[in-house]
Every structure is written in structure tokens, then in C-alpha cells.
């Protein structure tokens, strides 16, 4: 089960949810090695100062939003792609995107990333990152086809819904690498109140691939 401090929920209308599922639900997305014109945030420190190269004439915003997420080995934050970059990255992957969808998908993508970061900061509170100015994000990737052990247990043993997406984020805590995993769930429309908007739930927790991951989860389970 997801504890209250592990899950974030974000109400979205059904059309927005469908767009998110279509654009995020079936492919792994590039991580920190992706160039600045790929789907996720810019990974190249120089990309903040460069004018992106565009290859289509589609009329979409070229404005980019600077995130609140600090970047490892940089004094700057990660920067989100513009609507046009997002669209062209999908075109490059042969996803046949609808340009009108970008005005919905891009803000949702950015907002959910910010929520993920806030939950990671909650896990990292008083863990030593304050000594060097705070934790930073090193890299990230998405793979909706790969179930986490918790998601597998929930779906196969408890017969609950599978997450529609999964992300893996790696953060730097004053030189120590800590891995986090995020499962994305949504309410079943058949169960949801017809008067309410569907919800996207974020199950954010440290990965159990290191002693630090086990330690963080153990102390959190004790209420620390």
C-alpha cells in the first residue's frame, strides 16, 4: 500500500489523462544522456544558453520553463522543453503527436515532475543534503513497461491496477548517490465518482538497490 507521505495526487480531467497516457504510457523516455531537443528536461548545461534547433513549422510556443530542480555538477536548474521541442521529440520517435495536445501535456509533465521532486525532498529531509546546499538531480529515465517489485505485488497478488508509468530518478546528496523510483497510478473511471475528476497518484520512494535505500525506508516506516 502507498502511505500518505509516499503518494501525491493530482486531479486531471479525463481528456488530459488520456493525452498523458498516450504520450507517456508506452515508451521509455530519454534520461540524462539525451540532447536538449529530446523529450525530457535538458541534460546539457550549455543548452540553457543555446537557441534550440527546430525542424518543423508547427505553430507552438518555443518558451521554456526553468524547473525548481537543481542539476548535479551545475549551478543551474534543469530546464523543461518547450511545447515545440516536446512535439518534435515525439515526431522524431514516430509517435504521431497532435500539436494541440502539447498545450496540455507539457504543463502537466512539468507539474508532475515538480511534485515528484517535492516528495523526494521530503524523503531527503534531514539526511545531510543541507550541508552542501541541498540535493540535486543527476539523471532520470522512464520505462512504463517495467514493473517495480511493489507494483508487481500490488497487481499480481492484490489484484490492484498496474501503474501506467514508471520513472527512475538518481539524486546527488553531497557526493552520495541515492536512487528513487516513482510509480504513476490513476483512478479507475468505473470506480471514480462521476462528479469528480480522475486522480493521478505518485508513489515515490527510495529504491531498494542500496543500503541507503533500505535505511531511508526503514526510518520512514518508524515515523522519522
Swiss-Prot record:
Biased amino acid composition, Polar residues = 35-46
Q: Which UniProt keywords apply?
A: Heme, Iron, Lyase, Membrane, Metal-binding, Mitochondrion, Mitochondrion inner membrane
| Keyword Cell membrane among UniProt keywords | no
Regions of compositional bias (Basic and acidic residues) in chain numbering: 11-27
Q: Pfam families of this UniProt entry?
A: Cyto_heme_lyase
Where's it mainly located?
mitochondrion
The record's GO CC annotations read: mitochondrial inner membrane; mitochondrial intermembrane space; mitochondrion
Cell compartments where the protein resides: Mitochondrion inner membrane
Q: What is its EC number?
A: 4.4.1.17
Write the protein's name.
Answer: Holocytochrome-c1 synthase
